[in-house]
Amino acid sequence: MAFPPRRRLRLGPRGLPLLLSGLLLPLCRAFNLDVDSPAEYSGPEGSYFGFAVDFFVPSASSRMFLLVGAPKANTTQPGIVEGGQVLKCDWSSTRRCQPIEFDATGNRDYAKDDPLEFKSHQWFGASVRSKQDKILACAPLYHWRTEMKQEREPVGTCFLQDGTKTVEYAPCRSQDIDADGQGFCQGGFSIDFTKADRVLLGGPGSFYWQGQLISDQVAEIVSKYDPNVYSIKYNNQLATRTAQAIFDDSYLGYSVAVGDFNGDGIDDFVSGVPRAARTLGMVYIYDGKNMSSLYNFTGEQMAAYFGFSVAATDINGDDYADVFIGAPLFMDRGSDGKLQEVGQVSVSLQRASGDFQTTKLNGFEVFARFGSAIAPLGDLDQDGFNDIAIAAPYGGEDKKGIVYIFNGRSTGLNAVPSQILEGQWAARSMPPSFGYSMKGATDIDKNGYPDLIVGAFGVDRAILYRARPVITVNAGLEVYPSILNQDNKTCSLPGTALKVSCFNVRFCLKADGKGVLPRKLNFQVELLLDKLKQKGAIRRALFLYSRSPSHSKNMTISRGGLMQCEELIAYLRDESEFRDKLTPITIFMEYRLDYRTAADTTGLQPILNQFTPANISRQAHILLDCGEDNVCKPKLEVSVDSDQKKIYIGDDNPLTLIVKAQNQGEGAYEAELIVSIPLQADFIGVVRNNEALARLSCAFKTENQTRQVVCDLGNPMKAGTQLLAGLRFSVHQQSEMDTSVKFDLQIQSSNLFDKVSPVVSHKVDLAVLAAVEIRGVSSPDHVFLPIPNWEHKENPETEEDVGPVVQHIYELRNNGPSSFSKAMLHLQWPYKYNNNTLLYILHYDIDGPMNCTSDMEINPLRIKISSLQTTEKNDTVAGQGERDHLITKRDLALSEGDIHTLGCGVAQCLKIVCQVGRLDRGKSAILYVKSLLWTETFMNKENQNHSYSLKSSASFNVIEFPYKNLPIEDITNSTLVTTNVTWGIQPAPMPVPVWVIILAVLAGLLLLAVLVFVMYRMGFFKRVRPPQEEQEREQLQPHENGEGNSET
């Protein structure tokens, strides 16, 4: 029994997690697997063609093939349904696949109708491996039964083809039957070959699904084969044995791989055990000589299926095999903190001491099953380190599947994939499962680079991706002189006598690569001067002979030859043609391979090494008047003041900033004043009507959501420069939480050192100013008694039964500029005097954000309210004086002693309290109180022949503003509205005398006659015609005289 471990390695917190964000994926560039024209192979529909794949490289043949398992394919075996096949596909242009005949027979019987084995649905081809002339293919669901038992047992079987010999290999078809033995072994669930020509077979169902590994020599399998013997014993067999019950349902043999882990030169056995350790999962490494335990690895998350896939390869070039373990159901917490299934691959790097250092790669998509398959690729790009492929067969667009290519390096696996292969086939009845099976590390086209097969059994496909030869380019670029003196003009522009300052540009290429590559490589080289200048901007340097900032050149390089160079002359434009003298001039070189001419006979094109940049740049500097070091160091300063100390919220506040900018150091190039303005301010312009202020050129712009005013201060802003300028703003969009507005000012330049001034902030405080007024009016303002035809009624029902309508209107108006959010309005109404009613309130209305309540019942007698109103509710108070009253005034000679004033100091008053909501600038809230003059009171004998002044009063106080952090003063005021009641006779209007009317008409007629005479004397009534041709006059004249006819 080989289960007890020699050393257990738990993949816990000591590992170094490499958690990759999906944001890194767009950075992955396609490297050297050819994704543009892969070779695609297809099998019978529904056969699961592609469930297992491998290369087949017979040693005695120059041809190379692909092996593809189709475990649900039908065969020619008599009486067998979906027996399964392994197909051999020619990788060349024909791409034909032919089934390999391993077994042409049907089920064998003990006797007629007494079968020994059951080959239907046996899934032959579910696992396939090859080594030189040898092919091992298995059917893990093959069933058989002993003569004494009737139950079918899925022991599994395999067929081994060695050259021309084909033998059956069924190590689990033994006398150790039933579930406690090898009856449910499913031998061949996973398989592999060792370097020493041993086969390694996994049977995860043996011993109550503890699982089992079995290894036998190829030579002994072939030599001992006897078709008449069902259970063959092998002398040199290595196998794990049954263990304690605690190991039941572990699935040893679920996945297998081989590699040397103890340094004895013999391949050891690696197996995934995904349900071991209470479903944490384990991976066992057994000694390839005696099946003793070497190392164990334990997963860290239950049910992650740690060990679903395993692989072994030296990824970091230290000659020690490293272990890769897939856990496709691993769950990780997303950005929202919730667990989600992403899959994980553990990478355990073997050290010289036999220890392992483990890092982890998490998947990039949810439910993609990252780590379902892992395939060593060999040295895919020939950089000296092996590479590896990891599949996420249900990832990508529409779950078509993804395969990630990771490159090895000296420190281990590069955590960012260098290439991503995506499935291109839509799902049928099931997902395509692109990447569920993979095999690499074989150079099928013999170009010196290993290739990769990817299976997609859900669409019955297998895809061959060939590796493209990698070309490494060494590029050189030299600029001299690197300091350009504008005054040193030693070159002449061709065709002119104009002298210019020039410099040399020298560029070189060298190319080499491994594998099959052409001897000559063609490149297109692009040179660009002043690369960093944006498109459309003036480039400060041009090539001398083309007068262009760019240059193209085709260069043919000998592979592996010496560096090949060429040289060009460039010149500097005149300084009057550009502003930027400080920024270095970047000379940029880019090269591209002519892939078409570099392709091989099959059309496969090489590729440039992605780890070598395809461009190079150098810089040249313009000589400046900045001392010996050619480095200008300005000393920039800015100060600011404003013409306003306070800004009132809600007002259109004009604000002028007086800015002083100065440079006390060396020249500042492309100097600009940057004013960051708050959201509450808008830039109006520069003050230009003051001779003491500089008229700067300024513009408004938005950069990174920051609103700025940018003003040009000169190029350069010379030493000792002082500028005073005025900038005008309008501040009018303050929020309710603001207490001030802030402007940030800074001078910026393009200098390398001391390029900016300190930021200066200028704050202007905000203040609240609300001019709130209250005004009122009475309609009518005068009532004359007695009322014609009025009769007293004991129980009045209508308005006419009581008396005339009297309405008081109060308007609370905010003239701003600031708003208020709440105010209280208090109205006192003269209601009774000596128990006699004065003004009987029928109802009150409001217009605006206001709610009112009264301390007494309104209209307790339920007097019917007339639909005809003497005044309109929506009339403004200001318009009341312009309306004609129903009762007109007359001049009365009344002394103060004749008027009795009845206000709240004398009469009993009704109170109405109103809460007024928010009023912005220019808004009003209006209260309309409609009442009836209680005529009966004033018709009493003791009250007759007296005049009365009935006064209501209203007062308000603002109690709340929307501005939370600003000091606010109390705002209050009041007003009175008076209705006069007078005894007397209303004067009738005087009629206009008839003689006045006649005189007015005569005067009008006389004026009209004078106007007509004056206009006649001035020729106003004479008709003026434009000049006419003689013929036209002749035609028109008869008509003018009235003597013409109708003929023309």
Curated annotation (Swiss-Prot):
Recorded GO MF terms: coreceptor activity; extracellular matrix binding; extracellular matrix protein binding; fibronectin binding; integrin binding; metal ion binding; opsonin binding; protease binding
Residues the record lists as binding Ca(2+) 4: 443, 445, 447, 449, 451
Highest taxon of the lineage: Eukaryota
Stretches forming FG-GAP repeats: 32-98, 109-170, 173-225, 237-291, 292-357, 358-415, 419-482
Keywords noted in UniProt: Calcium, Cell adhesion, Cell junction, Cell membrane, Cleavage on pair of basic residues, Disulfide bond, Glycoprotein, Host cell receptor for virus entry, Host-virus interaction, Integrin, Membrane, Metal-binding, Receptor, Repeat, Signal, Transmembrane, Transmembrane helix
Carbohydrate attachment residues: 74, 290, 296, 488, 554, 615, 704, 835, 851, 874, 945, 973, 980
Positions of Ca(2+) 2 binding: 314, 316, 318, 320, 322
Disulfide bond entries: 89-97, 138-158, 172-185, 491-502, 508-565, 626-632, 698-711, 852-914, 904-909
A GO CC term assigned to this protein in UniProt: membrane
Annotated signal peptide: 1-30
UniProt key word Metal-binding: yes
Annotated positions binding Ca(2+) 1: 260, 262, 264, 266, 268
Annotated TM spans: 993-1016
Region annotation (Disordered) ranges: 1027-1048
Motif (GFFKR motif): 1019-1023
Membrane-topology annotation of the record: Single-pass type I membrane protein
One example of a Gene Ontology biological process annotation: calcium ion transmembrane transport
Misc remark: The constitutive activation of ITGAV:ITGB3 on neoplastic cells may contribute to tumor growth and metastatic potential.
SUBUNIT field: Heterodimer of an alpha and a beta subunit. The alpha subunit is composed of a heavy and a light chain linked by a disulfide bond. Alpha-V (ITGAV) associates with either beta-1 (ITGB1), beta-3 (ITGB3), beta-5 (ITGB5), beta-6 (ITGB6) or beta-8 (ITGB8). Interacts with CIB1. Interacts with RAB25. Integrins ITGAV:ITGB3 and ITGAV:ITGB5 interact with FBLN5 (via N-terminus). ITGAV:ITGB3 and ITGAV:ITGB5 interact with CCN3. ITGAV:ITGB3 interacts with ADGRA2. ITGAV:ITGB3 interacts with FGF2; it is likely that FGF2 can simultaneously bind ITGAV:ITGB3 and FGF receptors. ITGAV:ITGB3 interacts with IL1B. (Microbial infection) Integrin ITGAV:ITGB3 interacts with herpes virus 8/HHV-8 envelope glycoprotein B.
Entry protein name: Integrin alpha-V
